[in-house]
Every structure is written in C-alpha cells, then in structure tokens.
C-alpha cells in the first residue's frame, strides 16, 4: 500500500476467508480495492477446524480455485497433514482433506493480500455505511475516518453484534478473546436486515 485513495471502486469489510477472496478477486480484475479488518494479525484466521476439504467444503474450495481464488493455494502452502476421507465407502464419497497450520494459513493469506496489486489494507472497525439517498457511497470507521467507494462488500462473519455462549453464560464477542462490533449492525437492522 503506497497511499490511500480518495475514492475506491470496492471496499471489503472483514478479512476472513470470504473477505480475502472478495478483495483479491476485485483487485485482480482491476478494481481499486480497500480491505478493512479489525486485526491485521488475524487475516483469514481458521477459527474452528483448521481443515480445508471434505465433501462439502472441498467442493467450495475447488469452485473458488477454478475461478482464480486463493484458498486452495494458501491451503497447499500451509498443509501439515493430507488425508483421503471416506475410503471405506464408494468412490463417490471419497474426498481429500488438508489439515492446515492455523498460523501459517493466516500468514500466507496476509502475504497474498499485501502483495496483490490494486489492494490496500486498513485496520479499523467499520461502524457505519455512508449513504446518498438509497445508495451506499462508502464507510465510516470507529477512528472517525470515512472512505468513499462505488461498491461495499460486507463479509463480517460472526462479529456483527456478536454473542458467544459458554455453558449457560452469554457475553459479547466475535470469537474467543475478540470483541463484537457494534454500530453497523444497528444500521443494518434499521434497513430491515436480520442481524445476530
């Protein structure tokens, strides 16, 4: 990133797997793109099972790969174990699965987005969509900075007004030890979107 632009073609909010894929796809197609994330050290973090593949997820990874996405490549670079699942069943049920090193997976994705032309990164919390009548024109962050854009893609995952449950206890959060985000979720509710 050399210098932030006055107007972006695309702003992507959230740098999980979907956000990284969306930002790289837009940038690779020539759109000036800004990817905004809460934490640069947790780009594309594998929260639960650090695996790519299996019958369902494997199909999605292959489709993303066929469209030029990076998940399959990053998986190859971070795999610590590879296994063919369901070998006791017929060939139609066989499916490759790669267990990944979570930290390497995240670091490889960060390297990928940092070295993608037309893609800038910003660490902050988006709290509001900027509107001109019924058209989104950008975003405003918790730091009070406004970014203008022709398009905004929301890939917030579990963080919008997030609530975590451990046993009978519930508390705000996007993931363990990470805060939920507020503001944007309230605005989306005002416009009729289901949040939380």
What are these regions (language model features)?
Residues 4-18:
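Beta1/beta-strand and adjacent pyrophosphate-binding region of the FAD-binding site
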Residues 9, 137, 150:
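Conserved acidic residues
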Residues 13, 154-155:
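Redox-cofactor binding/interface segments in oxidoreductases and associated redox assembly factors
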Residues 138-142:
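Short beta-strand segments that buttress and anchor functional surface loops
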Residues 12, 23-26, 136:
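Conserved phosphate-binding elements of NTP-dependent enzyme cores
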Residues 3, 7, 24-128, 132, ...:
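Conserved N-terminal/central alpha/beta ligand/cofactor-binding core
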